[in-house]
């Protein structure tokens, strides 16, 4: 029987035409409204260079940000979605703080059923539900809770400091990211999920293996993420999940079993899970956190702490490692703290370390863990003219604006010599600078990252013990200058973070015994600083 191909061809052409129209119908959006906009490629939009891995996502954000340097805001296309990128700092402050009620939400993940770990977490929640959950979680980050979690962090960090200082002579060249993610994994496991793991001794533990899979945004994971966020109808049609079901089930089962065990045995721990358990029956009818809700909140805490914080520590260690004067000044401050505290750093002492604070904040400025963040308009808001003499623009409900964090923090108008690592920018008052309108790493206003104090403390404690015990020296594999990875949308180094790890020689002739998994070694002792070793 002869097949009539014409109806099939016509149907295919029609589908392609409809899809093309759907992808390109918005590309006159900014031209109609008189707003300057960044060039685009049909379907891929203005971020095509990042999607095709020509440049990193951070560099894409910076290029868009710099395209119209005199404009308060500019347009660009996230695939086919028109987005207004806000450049003016006062306008950003107005949007995120004073007029927060116009922009209270992020674009949500249209995947609550497929991906509850993303769809139900605090970052994705909107409106009253976001307020309820944030108010529930906020007590987890009070000073008293942070002080309790600091003790857990310190024990993990001391073990990693000892591990670094006792590497065999033929294994002292190390890529930092692997070790740092193991540390953040162990800290989050105990502080959020209430379980103890040791990823140095057991690098194949399920918590670490599944956590690494869930938070590692390589090429395929990043594409899935952007499709779910920017093309939800495609995600629905293809049933795309960001997190593999087996991984999501592992974390949910872990939370369910932990809660059941605590209820049955009367176990109480100072962690986020305990805090959520204690809200049961107190939030009102239909508002209690389900096991799925609790897992989603614990997971987003894990997601931010595991990948983002480990990356922050890598960039900070990289800059300290390649800047000898910075390393010496930091180690002098660390040595003084250890001397004052009789070898056991306290929560208060680490919080009062001005130079360590400055190193962390300068690292966050140069390498923000999130290079851009969105806000969704829920009621019309008038933007001033983008240039003098131009018309104002009214952002309508369901339209989206972007905060170009990487662009702002690399702008010489905001930070002179922006590509130079200079902790002294933040030395005078680091805590005040963390909330400044030009340092958006953790956001600004009510939607500011709830876990920012935890993330900074987690990074500070590890860096404290690494540099107390070791010097980081550039090696043949150290990438100078650093090149950002083009694969995926997470900010990291293209060639890893390679350094030679050298135990510090504080006083010749004295040694201390260090025990690490599988062996005992002797290294030169740091006098009167680690009496517990």
Segments the model singles out, each with a brief description of its role:
Residues 18, 50, 83, 207-284, ...:
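Cytochrome P450 catalytic core segment centered on helix I
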Residues 121, 139, 390-392, 402, ...:
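Cytochrome P450 heme-thiolate "Cys pocket" and heme-binding signature region
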Residues 50-70, 253, 257, 343-389:
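Conserved cytochrome P450 K-helix E-x-x-R motif and the immediately C-terminal K′/meander segment
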Residues 1-16, 76-84, 144-155, 165-190, ...:
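Cytochrome P450
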Residues 324-327, 452-492, 502:
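Cytochrome P450 heme-binding "Cys pocket" and the immediately downstream C-terminal segment
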């Amino acid at each position: 029987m002869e097949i009539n191909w014409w109806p099939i061809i016509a149907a295919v052409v029609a589908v392609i035409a409809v899809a093309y129209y759907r992808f390109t119908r918005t590309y006159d959006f900014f031209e109609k409204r008189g707003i300057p906009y960044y060039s685009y490629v049909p379907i891929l939009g203005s971020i095509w260079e990042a999607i095709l891995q020509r440049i990193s996502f951070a560099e894409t954000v910076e290029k868009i940000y710099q395209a119209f340097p005199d404009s308060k805001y500019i347009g660009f296309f996230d695939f086919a979605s028109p987005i207004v990128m806000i450049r003016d700092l006062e306008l950003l402050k107005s949007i995120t703080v004073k007029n927060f009620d116009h922009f209270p939400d992020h674009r949500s993940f249209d995947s609550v059923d497929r991906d509850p770990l993303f769809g139900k977490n605090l970052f994705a929640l909107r409106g009253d539900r976001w307020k309820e959950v944030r108010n529930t979680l906020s007590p987890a980050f009070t000073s008293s809770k942070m002080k309790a979690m600091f003790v857990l962090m310190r024990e993990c960090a001391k073990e990693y400091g000892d591990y670094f200082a006792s590497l065999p002579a033929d294994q002292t060249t190390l890529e930092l990211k692997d070790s740092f993610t193991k540390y953040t994994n162990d800290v989050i496991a105990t502080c959020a999920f209430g379980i103890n793991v040791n990823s140095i001794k057991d690098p194949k533990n399920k918590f670490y293996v599944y956590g690494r899979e869930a938070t590692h945004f390589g090429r395929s994971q990043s594409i899935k993420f952007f499709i779910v966020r920017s093309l939800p109808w495609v995600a629905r049609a293809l049933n795309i999940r960001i997190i593999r079901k087996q991984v999501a089930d592992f974390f949910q089962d872990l939370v369910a079993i932990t809660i059941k065990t605590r209820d049955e045995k009367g176990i109480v721990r100072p962690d986020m899970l305990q805090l959520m358990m204690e809200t049961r029956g107190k939030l009102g009818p239909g508002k209690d956190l389900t096991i799925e809700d609790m897992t989603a909140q614990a997971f987003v805490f894990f997601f931010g702490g595991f990948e983002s914080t480990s990356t922050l520590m890598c960039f900070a260690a990289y800059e300290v490692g390649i800047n000898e004067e910075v390393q010496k000044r930091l180690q002098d401050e660390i040595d003084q703290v250890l001397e004052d505290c009789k070898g056991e750093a306290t929560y208060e002492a680490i919080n009062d370390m001005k130079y360590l604070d400055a190193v962390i904040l300068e690292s966050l400025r140069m390498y923000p863990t999130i290079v851009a963040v969105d806000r969704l308009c829920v009621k019309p808001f008038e933007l001033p003219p983008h240039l003098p003499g131009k018309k104002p623009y009214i952002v309508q409900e369901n339209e989206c604006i972007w905060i170009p964090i990487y662009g702002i923090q690399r702008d010489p108008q905001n930070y002179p010599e922006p590509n130079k690592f200079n902790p002294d920018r933040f030395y005078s008052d680091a805590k005040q600078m963390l909330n400044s309108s030009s340092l958006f790493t953790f956001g600004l206003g009510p939607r500011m990252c709830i876990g920012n104090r935890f993330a900074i403390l987690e990074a500070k404690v590890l860096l404290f013990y690494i540099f107390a015990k070791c010097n980081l020296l550039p090696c043949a594999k150290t990438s100078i200058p650093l090149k950002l990875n083009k694969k995926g949308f997470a900010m990291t180094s293209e060639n890893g973070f390679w350094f030679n790890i050298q135990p510090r020689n504080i006083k010749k002739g004295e040694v201390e015994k260090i025990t690490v998994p599988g062996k005992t070694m002797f290294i030169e002792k740091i006098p009167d600083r680690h009496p517990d070793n």
